[in-house]
Amino acid sequence: MSANGNAALGVRLTEDQVKVLEENFTKVSKHPDETTLMLIAAECGLSEEQTAVWFRMRNAQWRKAEGLPAELGSVKD
């Protein structure tokens, strides 16, 4: 993801927002629960929906970089 967000979020992210999102992605959870998502959104000044979209897109980017299937549970023998 670009450092300033993207069109899917409908908002340009600041460096501080990206830093908070990335730290949570790498140190807390790649799949935050509803409460954690709400707290991250509040810290970033984003809506819960925008934050959830960011995590979905960031997960897709991470999975692609790791050579993993596009979706969870889609590993094939």
Curated annotation (Swiss-Prot):
Where does the record place it? Nucleus; Cytoplasm
Has the keyword Repressor been applied to this entry? Answer: yes
Q: Name one GO biological process term.
A: regulation of transcription by RNA polymerase II
Going by the UniProt record, its keywords in alphabetical order are: Cytoplasm, Developmental protein, Homeobox, Nucleus, Repressor, Transcription, Transcription regulation
Q: Where are the transmembrane segments?
A: none
What Pfam families has UniProt attached to this entry? Homeodomain
Which residue stretches, if any, does this entry annotate as coiled coil? none
Lineage, top-rank taxon, reads Eukaryota
Example GO CC term: the record gives:
nucleus
Cite the SUPFAM superfamilies for this sequence: Homeodomain-like
Gene3D superfamilies the UniProt entry points to: Homeodomain-like
Kindly give the InterPro entries that the UniProt entry links to this protein. HD, Homeodomain-like_sf, HOPX
Q: Which coarse location class describes where this protein primarily resides?
A: nucleus
Q: Name one GO molecular function term.
A: DNA binding
Q: Does the keyword Cytoplasm apply?
A: yes
Task: Name the SMART domains on file.
Answer: HOX
Q: Per the database entry, where does the chain bind DNA?
A: 7-65
Sum up the protein's function in the record's words: Atypical homeodomain protein which does not bind DNA and is required to modulate cardiac growth and development. May act via an interaction with SRF, leading to modulate the expression of SRF-dependent cardiac-specific genes and cardiac development. May act as a co-chaperone for HSPA1A and HSPA1B chaperone proteins and assist in chaperone-mediated protein refolding.
Protein name as catalogued? Homeodomain-only protein
